[in-house]
Structure formats: C-alpha cells, structure tokens
Amino acid sequence: MDGDADAVKSGRHGSGQACQICGDGVGTTAEGDVFAACDVCGFPVCRPCYEYERKDGTQACPQCKTKYKRHKGSPAIRGEEGEDTDADDVSDYNYPASGSADQKQKIADRMRSWRMNAGGGGDVGRPKYDSGEIGLTKYDSGEIPRGYIPSVTNSQISGEIPGASPDHHMMSPTGNIGKRAPFPYVNHSPNPSREFSGSIGNVAWKERVDGWKLKQDKGAIPMTNGTSIAPSEGRGVGDIDASTDYNMEDALLNDETRQPLSRKVPLPSSRINPYRMVIVLRLVVLSIFLHYRITNPVRNAYPLWLLSVICEIWFALSWILDQFPKWFPINRETYLDRLALRYDREGEPSQLAAVDIFVSTVDPMKEPPLVTANTVLSILAVDYPVDKVSCYVSDDGAAMLTFDALAETSEFARKWVPFVKKYNIEPRAPEWYFSQKIDYLKDKVHPSFVKDRRAMKREYEEFKVRINGLVAKAQKVPEEGWIMQDGTPWPGNNTRDHPGMIQVFLGHSGGLDTEGNELPRLVYVSREKRPGFQHHKKAGAMNALVRVSAVLTNGQYMLNLDCDHYINNSKALREAMCFLMDPNLGRSVCYVQFPQRFDGIDRNDRYANRNTVFFDINLRGLDGIQGPVYVGTGCVFNRTALYGYEPPIKQKKKGSFLSSLCGGRKKASKSKKKSSDKKKSNKHVDSAVPVFNLEDIEEGVEGAGFDDEKSLLMSQMSLEKRFGQSAAFVASTLMEYGGVPQSATPESLLKEAIHVISCGYEDKTEWGTEIGWIYGSVTEDILTGFKMHARGWRSIYCMPKRPAFKGSAPINLSDRLNQVLRWALGSVEILFSRHCPIWYGYGGRLKFLERFAYINTTIYPLTSIPLLIYCVLPAICLLTGKFIIPEISNFASIWFISLFISIFATGILEMRWSGVGIDEWWRNEQFWVIGGISAHLFAVFQGLLKVLAGIDTNFTVTSKASDEDGDFAELYMFKWTTLLIPPTTILIINLVGVVAGISYAINSGYQSWGPLFGKLFFAFWVIVHLYPFLKGLMGRQNRTPTIVVVWAILLASIFSLLWVRIDPFTTRVTGPDTQTCGINC
C-alpha cells in the first residue's frame, strides 16, 4: 500500500506518461498535476490530442466513450458557448471538484489502474489482480482510522458450497446460532510492478490527430481521410508499425473490444412520423368532439347525455395516459461477438459477471413439479460459464414433493446438460424440445446425434415417470406427516410453521455430469415461517432468495423467473450482459426486461393471452424514455439497484422541448455550483425517496474517520439497521462486483444463509420498503420497478430474435379473468397507497412520460366504471327510444367521422411500426372490454374494501397444469365464477334491446329507422366486443357453430315479434262503421 502511494505521488508530479494516441508526453496542468483528459477512466491523452478531439473529433474518450468536459484554459467549442459549463468541474458525474486532493488521488488511481490493464484484453477499465494479491490491510493490526467502513470489492467467488448427495437432505437450524463473530473482511492490494503497456487505439483516428498537429505547427496542410501524413509504402494490415511496435491486426482487435456492446436503433422516420402526426390530429379532433358534446346537451334525455359525456371525458384522459408514453419507441441491437471478445475470450478465464437465477414456486398441485423441473433444466443448460451460474429454487409451500422432484432433476441434469451442449439444441427444456413438430435433424451433422437423441428421449420419459410417481404418492398425505429417506420427519409438514431449509444439490463439489464437467449450482430454499409473522407472499420469498444468494454466491446480477417460464434462448444471459456490462450504459441500468412469450395458446388467442400489444408496443415505447416497467418474470436485475442505491448522477445538458417532455432537467445556476456534491445529489430526490449511494460509503472510508471502536460499531449498526443483523450479508452488499470472501467456510456460510431467511430477520429493517422487492401490493413487480425508476435508474427492453423465455398462460375463461383480477387489484392497491405515482417521488429523477405510464398502470382499473355505464347505455336507448346524441348537422357529422377515422388510423400505424397483427390488435381490444366490465370492476371494489375496511382478499396461484384431455381441452371447460355475471348481464340486455328497437321501428313506420341505426350500431359495438366471452360462456359446440346459435336466437325473436305485430290470421276489412250506418248501410 505504501509503495502504491509513492507510485501515485511520483506519477502525479511527473510527466513521464505517454499519450496513447501520439506517443508524446501527457504533460501537466498549470498547477503541476498530471493532465487527465478523461476523469472517468483516466485514459492517457495529451493536451493537443484532447483539444483536437474536442474540436474536430467525436468529443469523447477513445476508451470509455464518455464525452470530454471542458478543462480550465481550454477554448469553448461550438455548442458549449451557450451552455452552463464549469471549466473546473470536468467530471460527468458528481465527484468532488477537480482541484481537491481527493479528486487528484482518484484520477491518479484510475490512470494507474488503466496502466495495469492496457493491452490485457477484455474488461477494459476494471483493475485486475493476481490470485496471490488478496490480503488484509494494515488496519488489521488494530489501527482503525476515522470513518473506516470495512468493504470488499472485486472478490473472486470462492469458498464453494459443497453439493450434497441425495442422502444429505438439508440444513435447518437445530437451535440458536448464538452470537455471530465478526465476518472477516478482505481488501485488494494491486500489484504496482506490472509493466505499463500502451494501446494504439483507432489507427485512422491517430492519423487524423497527427495531421491536426502538423496543421497547428505549419499552417493549413491538406488531409485526406484514411491517409497518413507520412505513409509507409507497401505496408499491409498485418505489418508492424515502427512507431508503436504493435501488430496492426492486434490493434484492430483491441479497437473492436472498445466498441459498444449494444446500440439503439431508431424507427424509420417514414413509419414513426406519420404515427405521431395522426396522434396530434386525433388529439385536436378529440378536443373539438368533446367541446361539441359538452355544448350540445340532449334536452329530453339529459341524465343519459350527462353520463355519456362524463364517460367520454374519462376515456379521453385514459387514452392520453396510454398513448403519449408510446411517442418514442425504439429497437435495440446487441453484439454477442463483442461481448465475447471483451469478457469471454477462448482459452482465457471468463470475465463475465456471475448471475444468480431465482425460480419461485408455492403449490406443487397447481404448479406441477414437471413444469418446474423443465425450467430448472433449461437454466442448468444455459450457454454461460458454469462457475458463473447459480440456480435458487424457492419453495414457499415447503412441499416434500418439490424437494424430491428437485433431487430427481439434479440427477437427470447430469445426462441432459452435456447432451444439449454437445449438439447445441434449442430450447433446452426437454418437454418442449421433444414436443416440437419440426425437422429435428436439420443442421445436425454429427453421426451419433440420432442415436444419442433416441437414448436421451428414453431417459427423459423414464424421468417423467419417476416425477409422476412422486406426484401420485403426494396425493394422499399420511396422518403422521411425510417421512424422509433417513426416517426423520419432514420439517415442512406444517406449511405455516416450519424452520428454514437449504439444500445444495449441485455445484463445485456436488458431482459432475456424465462427461466429467462441472454443473451450475442448484440450491433448494424454503424460508422459515412462524405464526404471527407477516410473510408478504411472493415478494417476501424473493427477498429471502436475494439474501441467501448474497451470502452463498453473491452474483453481481440476478435473473427472476416464474416456475413455468423456461429459458427458450440459451444465450439470453449474454443478451442481458450486452447492456449490463457495457462500460457506458451498464452503470445506470437497474434491470433488463425481456418480453413474455407463451406456449400452449389456442391458435386464435381467444382471450388475448399473448398480450402482444403491451409487450411489442407499450414497452418498446417506454424503452425510449426511461425503460420498461418490471413485469414480474424474465428480468435480469442489477443487485446494486435492488439494494436501494442510486445510480451515478449525470449532469443534465440543455436539450430540446421534446427532450424536456421526456424528463430533461435544467442545470443548476452558476451561483449554486460551489455547493457540495452531496447537496447536488439531494436536490434530485424527494424526501420520500431514500437514496443510498455507494460513493457515500467510499467517502466515509477515505475521509476523516472514527477514533474508537464505539464509533466504528455505530457505523456498522447503521448498515445492519438497513440490511439486517448479518455481518456476512452486510459485507456482501459492499462488494461492487459480487463474490464471497475466500476465507469464508461453507459451514459458516450455510449457517448465515439459514439466519437470513428466518421469519424475524426483516423486522426493523428497510426490506420491502426501500430494499429488494417492495411490499404493499400483490403486483410487487410494478411497485419494485417504480421505486428504482424514481431513484433515477433506467431499464432496458431486450427483444432478441429468438424469444429469451417462454411460459404458460391460462386459456380457460375463468382462470384468465382471475389472473386479470389479481393484476388489477394490485394496481388499485398501489393507487391508494403512499407509492401512488400521481404524487410519489416528485422532485426525484422519474421522467415525465415515464410517470404517465406508471399512472396509467395503476389507474386503468377505474376505467371499468365508465366502461360499464357505456356498455349499458345502448340497451337503455333502444328500450326507451331516447339517445345520448342530439340530431346532428352535416358539419357536426364531420367531427364524428374524423374521430372514428383517427382512431382507426392510430391503430393501423401502430401495427405498422410495431409488427403486431390486426388479429392480435383486435383481440386485445375485445378483451379490454371483457376484462374491464368484469375483473377490473371487481378489483376496484375489492381494493376499496381492503383499503377502507381492511378486508383482505386471498391470493390465488394461477394454475400451470397442462392439458391432459386433448389439445386446448381447458379452453372449452366451463368454470363458473361471479366474474361472469356482469358481462353476461350486459350481453342479454343488449340483445333484448336490439330486438325491442327493431320491433319499435316496425311499429312506428319508416320514419323511425334513421335514429335506430345509430342506436343499433352502438349496441352491436358492445356485442361484437363481447363475442369471445359469449363463445367461452357457451363452451364447446360439437355440432352447431356458436355464431349460428346466436343468430338463430336473435332472428327467431325478431320474427316472433313481427308475427305478433302483423297477426296474419285476423281479417281486416276497410269500410263504413256499422254502428253509424246501421243494418241497412
């Protein structure tokens, strides 16, 4: 450490550093310090190269691509004259001012770190350490400085958890763990003896700099792109450049590793611009239409008119909240080859970040073990370094069936994983792979593939039989409870009162596959449950997995999957890493969300289960603002973001009016520039949005510290108050790049893991309020994502060509409505909570249109009330003979026609840029009405009962069972529920209204047919939207199509009423009145 300090000091006041562009000395500033062009990565660039790049180049650092800030003494360039810049504050992030000693030290450390990494391949900008360089710091001797908080960074994952054989079932506490000793902390000591090696960077860029320097010295000298001032004749790409002693091919490869790992792909202007124009036109037409409706009441039907106008105003507001977050849709591309070049070169240890994958399950009767097993198998076979993947299965029902099924799965994985990796098959869930109706021999050239596939299919069928046997055995619970293989009672016999359980099935020492290769870790977790403790359902289970994984493996990133969502694209994790590990983008990304795709849905998607309008339109629109909302599964998280920390704060630049709509913030005035960085950070965040910054902890370590052990203890207590009473877990939160300390033993880690899943661990901590999955709603996903966005994080929407994950969806009408009811109930709970996006987090860093989207996500169930009224109005109008619209003139009819045209045009152009089919769009419109007048309506009243009266509703797990009685047998199964009553009632009264309206028109003559057409159109609009519901209500019709039955009943009713009206058997004779004329008339 002392040697490092001396090296830094000598480097700060020396000028021996070479510019990595031209080879000249970097030089010093006016104060005598080493000139640092980029304060983010410390890439050595001399002053002339820096000035050229700002004036004529890309204005960004060649290594990290961060835009250069103007240094003291540098002339302003075009675009900077009107900006509120500070030449002294050259950082793009809130570091201390450049003149301070802390900043100088940070710059020197960054430049020294770059020296150690230059020329070493991937992981640019991150310090690398030899395995023997990890040791305790000098503070171990007892010298504890003031403000010192022990922290660990960049630790390698070690202290592997041994896998257990099937006879070692679990580890559960046999008694009180007792007083836990302080967890050993380690720190890194970089090796200062590593040789400095430069990098040529971009060759063409270097040549432009050389020409610019000559032009500055000798006047204007013409240059041509790609031509050096002093070219070497006959030199090819593979020749040696004498000025740098570097091979050109290596230089080009090195330049490739510096390229971004992903990029935004804006939509073509020919598609997005007409779409935006139609939105604006529709807004104008809608305003004129509402003005006309308000100023032209219907005198003889005033109540009906008033109700309709209120509903139409609400629909307009709802449309605005839904439409404008789709103003900036984008696509994204990833470069997996660049990711491999930078972090996963062949023949070298992989530098990819570790990922902990969470699978959650509750009830094995509703979530079949075979479905969960397929999900786990697809995870274990993912295309990612095995030592970087850990799979944690949360069994919140403490079912022995789930435990035994995982034991069987771990054994079958030893055969399945090498098979799929050998032949590179997709998908890697065996159930779905073997059920594919495709040519499985396509692109397969290995002579033994057919034989191996046949043998593997037989192995899988035997595996299915064993799982089915476990399920059959579990149907009848013994009176004395379940007994394990060793004769001891199963600890989870009482699902509401049992200890925490952890079992490691696979891992470093948990056995190898059939080819002798290591398998990813597979860990079974069942958190402790006791009566009288609030367990917070799925959110509580996910937070328990976060803590267990942090103690055992501490992957830098986490993937959350439902038990029925398997990995369909084995490169899904690499796709996510293209964003999360990108040096420019990754540091501000809280999660990468993938779209949900589904198997087993009927061809017509009767109940809009695919939900492509939401996943392919709405979320792509949000990706252009601050990122998509978290949808509960298929999401890769940055662990730091889940811990409640804030992202690095970027100083906002002045932008256009449209960028301000997206949330751009004005810069602080010059008079406030001299305030501290902490005050600047706090300006962005409301008091209701607590923010914890890792930089604050680092400053506490570096600054004036504590004088005694009592002050150090107070600092540790503040962290334990936030994260809980676990020294091991608190230490893991300070490891920026994940990993567990090498000195930790598997036994101590397992004991600590049992402790962090105890039912009382979260008491008096910030779990569920500021850290982890947020409590307070059954849709914890929306709330969790909203909290992270409010802190300033952004999310990414990744849509690879091959869907990353696939799952199952309820195709039965009743199950689908119950699923929608749960989602809507969660939104209502958020709406009436303190986290309501209408008022929560103002003054923070949530962008304006992103807030629009969250408001729409929570307020949409309320639309069910005006929608229900609007669906009843047609029948009332037909039965009473009145209408909600007065007689309109030809001029007024133009606005009605224009409104309908703009509605259809918006939909058509939306489908055009998104690729969503018209059938999918129409199914979404239909189910919006079906769900609105049933599930959403019930959710509003249940939410009000919960908030006002404290009456809680039970959370029901959506069944994931597959069809066993034929294809889509569940689609036609009739399951009665109270959710079916409102749509059924509306259907009947509208059909009766149609019959009554036609009869009335016949009775009144041809003069009544004109007003009738408007009423009939109104009624048929409701009936057509409810047609899928009507089909589901009638079930399977083996002989007569449903549409025939409906029209038969409708036409029979009309003709019956006509028959009664005409009464053809009654003789009607026209003549004089017999009473007047008498008998002789």
UniProtKB/Swiss-Prot annotation:
Gene Ontology BP terms: cell wall organization; cellulose biosynthetic process; plant-type primary cell wall biogenesis
CDD domains assigned to the protein according to its UniProt record, in alphabetical order: mRING-HC-C4C4_CesA (cd16617)
Residue pairs linked by disulfide bridges in the UniProt entry: none
Gene Ontology terms, MF aspect: cellulose synthase (UDP-forming) activity; cellulose synthase activity; zinc ion binding
Cofactor list: Mn(2+); Zn(2+)
UniProt keyword Transferase, yes or no: yes
Protein purpose: Probable catalytic subunit of cellulose synthase terminal complexes ('rosettes'), required for beta-1,4-glucan microfibril crystallization, a major mechanism of the cell wall formation.
Protein name: Probable cellulose synthase A catalytic subunit 8 [UDP-forming]
Taxonomic path: Eukaryota, Viridiplantae, Streptophyta, Embryophyta, Tracheophyta
